[in-house]
Amino acid sequence: MRKIILASGSPRRKELLELASVPFEIVVSEVEETIGAYSSPSDIVMSLALQKASAVAENNSDHIVLGADTIVTYESRILGKPSNEDEAKEMLQLLSGKTHEVYTGVAIIAKEKTVTFYERTEVTFWELTEEEIDTYVASKEPFDKAGSYGIQGKGSIFVQNIQGDYYSVVGLPIARLVRELKQFDIDVTHA
């Protein structure tokens, strides 16, 4: 029996698959993420998702492997995960009072085919005070999240508006993923 393998150690992606009753196992991709010369954020996230899934699929060719990647962009600037407090504060100051875009790319690899897709969501932040930013950064929540915030956590209080898929901002566009899995004869809507 084919298994679904999530090529990610992200606790948020794990929670979203569990929420949707998708049966899966985790094999963390150890691939070094490389961003080449891509023309768009959507190309970047789909390429990174494919890199992660491909690395795990090499040793799991009889199964279905899922890879995903999320980035935040503001005015053509890519905001990944912050490497320190100053970088986290800088990102949050940049996003304060403005609308930014969150892209999550997904790759599904199986013997018979490979599917990649992405979702784009616009998120608008309230104006943030320096104290709000300092307190949030001190909580350590920003450090494993693209754009330095978690919409599903304490960072939720910064969000004024969202246009698009909330779960994509969390890290996995689960409704779209469930529909795409039907191409691989996986239907969790009747489970």
From Swiss-Prot:
Say yes or no: keyword Cytoplasm present. Answer: yes
Broadest EC class assigned to this enzyme: hydrolase
Q: What is its main location?
A: cytoplasm
Q: What is its EC number?
A: 3.6.1.9
Active site at: 69
Print the keywords alphabetically. Cytoplasm, Hydrolase, Nucleotide metabolism
The entry's protein name is dTTP/UTP pyrophosphatase
Q: What is the lineage of its organism?
A: Bacteria, Bacillati, Bacillota, Bacilli, Bacillales
